[in-house]
């Protein structure tokens, strides 16, 4: 659509989404003898924030308009992240839910913030005298643009470029570019992604000049013949000429260089036209190439040089491409003739200091994490990313699902129910051009990237004729890639939209049933293993599905926690939904990453790295662990002397060679443990451990409600009595019995056996018919003084019954700490432990006291050593709300509930990783004295 004057009514008209905007084009760069023809407009802009359109400075775009009262703002950057408006995180609901009664395509005119931007610039010498355009790489959500008082254009779609021709509006010397950004428009109904809601110019802005003859659009169309050694190149170009110039007689020269620099092709490329507006280069066959894939992402540099009829070079375009072949055969996706497996993640663009306005360093770091952890695929959820990310995926062999900027789940998912009565875009004709334009804009920009194997029509937008039109666009324009859309699962009438059967969070048994039904389509999980908090348990059940050829992997949800730095109780902390005073919100549901918001890997990453490795390397890892564990031998306990028993009215004292213990009848257990004149180790007598702080997955499946009795039991056990079962100079054994305030009532015994050099502890839980599942069973003790270090022999990192295979067996050490889960929850468990040692240290980090615990009866145990109790973790909403106790809470466990990972809103952990309250459970260990 073209227009010479702007109209506010466009904001509510889904048929108006681009006014005077240039056609979308490939992301290629070009240069001339004068060098690069780009000029960045990033940096400081003048800025005014208005709470509504009525309050905006309506004439700020006039060339002589005063900017008094305007501030400065950084571009790129979100407006909310620079002190204006309201930061808001929300998942499914629309941001205005409960504040404004709206239906598509309308907006709340009195609650639509506006950002007014002004940038003055002088054209660089290299751009002067040429056709000059401006490119906005990303603006949320809708914007109008003026140059030197002239209306330039209007655009929606926050995540693809919007280019406008400025040539007719530029003047010598200083120029004034004005941009008016609106937070809400009809397009807002299509951008209901599960993320923080921002607006503003959040990606780069730059000017670019076109030579007299210019390659407007380029599609290399690189391919691979079935021999996997012969590459093909069939460029398609769209050319333009400046006023007074002519394309008549122009020529194109093509050079192809191998990764090492060797030139494989260097010759003129004849062009032909077919009346479509494109010209086509004569196809080229290149024998002896290396096929592109994850293991060898070989990229070849194609250089196209455009000359005019006189032979003068007009511009040179370099582009890196790989040669590969992708498609379906017998219902299986194949890359270069071999079945492909996606070991993928979903990735939002995110930085905790700047939101989605990320920089190159964020992308480089993410790519390093991908390569280090065997991640070979990424889905750009749920919008196209910055161009640099695609280049990095090309270079590193990361397979891509490139997803269009479309998500409207708030229009058909209400309180988790499917209710599409006013779903957009659906089959509404007034929305069709808008969503197809989003598909086209993504396709045209990204089509040359070798890494992209699949186009996605968007996310969670139900289905209908409009999304079918998107799919048809991809199929008609790019037969060399597949089309993905998960939403047809909810509306099978439009099953033809997707070439792939794609699901979210389907359970392994459901997938198995599909795979055994002789399906026509291959299966992927576009989202699975919801890594909210302490999660990612049970991944093995999905990996085992790879035995079915049509199961081709999935994409973990998701890569990085979405959280923002804010002022907290003790300084800077990461805030989540609701922390910024916004309502409505979905609180911490934004924290689902396999890395924390600061980019550090979560403890679960070692398991993802293991399961995303090759079967051969997993087998080698398992064999290495088995060998190391089998070779481990407990050292013999030292020879101990006779025991001295001191019988008091309230305490039973036991002293031996280098140690002294006290067992309290009143306290109900071990009240004191000292070694060789060292410090006191026991703060309060150990108790049966019956509760862990609920994980996000526990909460989601209702486990804390079903098993809440154990929280009270853990906090308020009753020592019913004691019995001294043996008392001699060789051995002392005392048993304590505990009852718990549960219905039905339950009990446990804690037995201490002292010998000349050791204290053995045996804990037994007595199962009761009708008792709910336990989260844990073991023994918990707090030290009087904090341990500076805990060392253990067993599995590395944080492990659970359903998340331990990626750990390595060995000797490990760490400072007792709470991992950086956004919301405190159970953490720090170490499975399959043989020994552990708590160390106290002086200021020089020298060990001053140590307490060692070893397994009993050759039976390993699990343990955690944390600075906080389960109750303290349960009560805190942020890590900085945890009290500084000055103690270490040591929990030794014989039974541990898994963490789960299928989803965080209803699915329980796998049955094998639950703890039945009707059965007996026990744990035994030995404390060296």
Where would I find each of the regions flagged by the language model?
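Extended acidic/polar, glycine-enriched regions
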Residues: 168-174, 238-327
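An acidic-aromatic loop/edge-strand motif
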Residues: 78-107, 156-158, 166-231, 235, ...
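Accessory beta-strand-rich segments of carbohydrate-active enzymes
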Residues: 2-16, 25-27, 32, 46-50, ...
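Extended substrate-binding grooves/exosites of carbohydrate-active enzymes
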Residues: 1-33, 150, 189, 313-635
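Surface beta-strand/loop "capping" patches
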Residues: 212-243, 607-650, 763
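Short strand-edge motifs at loop-to-beta-strand transitions and within beta-strands
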Residues: 117-119, 160-164, 277-284, 921
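Beta-strand/loop-rich accessory regions of lumenal/periplasmic or secreted enzymes
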Residues: 80-82, 88-90, 183, 293, ...
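Short strand-turn-strand beta-turns centered on an Asx-Gly dipeptide
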Residues: 146-152, 259, 336, 657, ...
């Amino acid at each position: 659509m073209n227009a010479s004057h702007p109209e506010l009514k466009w904001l509510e008209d889904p048929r108006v989404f681009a006014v005077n905007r240039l056609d979308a084009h490939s992301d290629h760069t070009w240069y001339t003898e004068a060098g690069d023809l780009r000029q960045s407009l990033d940096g400081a802009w003048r800025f005014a924030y208005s709470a509504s359109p009525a309050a905006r400075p309506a004439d700020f775009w006039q060339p002589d308009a005063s900017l008094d009262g305007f501030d400065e703002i950084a571009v790129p950057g979100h407006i909310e992240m620079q002190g204006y408006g309201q930061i808001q995180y929300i998942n499914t609901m629309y941001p205005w839910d409960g504040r404004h009664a709206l239906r598509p395509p309308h907006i709340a005119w009195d609650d639509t913030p506006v950002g007014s931007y002004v940038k003055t610039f002088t054209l660089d010498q290299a751009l002067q005298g040429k056709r000059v355009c401006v490119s906005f790489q990303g603006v949320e959500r809708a914007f109008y643009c003026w140059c030197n008082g002239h209306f330039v254009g209007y655009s929606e779609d926050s995540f693809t470029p919007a280019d406008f021709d400025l040539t007719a509006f530029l003047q010598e010397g200083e120029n004034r570019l004005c941009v008016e950004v609106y937070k809400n428009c009809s397009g807002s109904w299509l951008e209901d992604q599960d993320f923080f809601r921002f607006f503003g110019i959040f990606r780069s802005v730059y000017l670019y000049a076109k030579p007299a003859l210019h390659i407007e659009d380029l599609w290399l169309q690189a391919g691979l013949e079935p021999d996997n050694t012969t590459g093909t190149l069939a460029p398609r170009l769209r050319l333009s000429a400046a006023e007074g110039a002519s394309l008549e007689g122009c020529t194109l020269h093509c050079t192809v260089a191998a990764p090492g620099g060797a030139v494989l092709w260097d010759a003129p490329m004849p062009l032909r036209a077919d009346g479509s507006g494109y010209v086509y280069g004569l196809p080229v066959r290149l024998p002896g190439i290396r096929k592109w894939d994850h293991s060898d992402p070989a990229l070849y540099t194609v250089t196209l040089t455009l000359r005019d009829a006189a032979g003068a070079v007009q511009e040179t375009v370099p582009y890196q491409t790989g040669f590969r072949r992708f498609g379906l055969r017998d219902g299986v996706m194949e890359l270069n003739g071999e079945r492909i497996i996606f070991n993928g993640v979903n990735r939002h663009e995110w930085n905790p200091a700047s939101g989605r306005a990320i920089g190159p360093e964020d992308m480089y770091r993410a790519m390093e994490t991908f390569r280090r952890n065997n991640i070979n695929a990424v889905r750009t959820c749920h919008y196209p990313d910055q161009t640099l990310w695609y280049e990095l995926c090309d270079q590193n062999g990361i397979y891509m699902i490139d997803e269009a900027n479309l998500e409207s789940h708030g229009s058909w998912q209400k309180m988790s129910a499917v209710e599409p009565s006013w779903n957009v875009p659906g089959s509404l004709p007034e929305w069709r051009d808008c969503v197809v334009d989003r598909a086209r804009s993504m396709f045209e920009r990204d089509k040359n990237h070798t890494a992209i194997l699949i186009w996605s029509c968007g996310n969670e937008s139900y289905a209908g004729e409009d999304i079918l039109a998107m799919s048809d666009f991809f199929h008609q324009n790019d037969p060399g890639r597949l089309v993905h859309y998960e939403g047809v699962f909810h509306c099978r009438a439009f099953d033809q939209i997707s070439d792939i059967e794609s699901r979210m969070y389907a359970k392994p048994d459901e997938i198995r049933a599909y795979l055994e039904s002789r399906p026509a389509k291959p299966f992927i999980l576009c989202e699975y293993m919801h890594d909210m908090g302490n999660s990612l348990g049970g991944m093995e059940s999905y990996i085992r599905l790879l035995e079915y050829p049509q199961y081709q992997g999935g994409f973990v949800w998701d890569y990085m926690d979405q959280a923002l730095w804010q002022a907290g109780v003790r300084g800077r902390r990461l805030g989540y939904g609701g922390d910024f005073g916004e309502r409505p919100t979905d609180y911490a549901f934004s924290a689902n990453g396999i890395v924390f918001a600061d980019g550090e890997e979560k403890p679960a990453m070692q398991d993802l790295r293991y399961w995303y490795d090759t079967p051969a390397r997993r087998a080698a890892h398992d064999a290495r662990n088995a060998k190391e564990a089998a070779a481990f031998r407990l050292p013999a306990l030292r020879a101990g002397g006779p025991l001295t028993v001191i019988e008091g009215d309230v305490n039973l004292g036991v002293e031996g060679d280098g140690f002294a213990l006290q067992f309290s009848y009143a306290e109900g257990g071990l009240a004191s443990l000292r070694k060789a004149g060292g410090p006191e180790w026991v703060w309060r007598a150990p108790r049966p451990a019956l509760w862990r702080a609920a994980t996000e997955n526990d909460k989601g499946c209702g486990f804390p409600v079903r098993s809440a009795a154990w929280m009270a039991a853990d906090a308020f056990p009753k020592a019913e009595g004691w019995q001294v079962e043996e008392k001699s100079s060789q051995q002392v054994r005392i048993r304590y019995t505990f009852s718990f305030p549960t219905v039905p009532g339950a009990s446990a015994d804690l037995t201490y056996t002292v010998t000349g050099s050791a204290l053995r502890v045996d804990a037994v839980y007595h199962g009761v018919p009708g008792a709910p599942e336990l989260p844990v069973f073991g023994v918990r003790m707090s030290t009087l003084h904090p341990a500076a270090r805990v060392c253990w022999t067993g599995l590395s990192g944080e492990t659970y019954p359903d998340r331990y295979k990626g750990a390595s067996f060995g000797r490990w050490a760490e400072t007792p700490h709470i991992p950086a889960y956004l919301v405190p929850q159970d953490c720090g468990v170490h499975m399959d432990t043989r020994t552990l040692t708590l160390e106290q240290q002086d200021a020089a980090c020298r060990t001053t006291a140590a307490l060692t615990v070893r397994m009993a009866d050759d039976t390993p145990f699990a343990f955690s050593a944390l600075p906080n109790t389960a109750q303290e973790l349960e009560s805190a909403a942020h890590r900085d709300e945890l009290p500084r106790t000055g103690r270490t809470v040591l929990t030794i466990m014989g039974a541990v509930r898994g963490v789960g990972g299928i989803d965080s809103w209803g699915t329980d952990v796998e049955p094998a990783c639950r703890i039945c309250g009707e059965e007996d459970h026990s744990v035994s260990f030995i404390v060296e004295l």
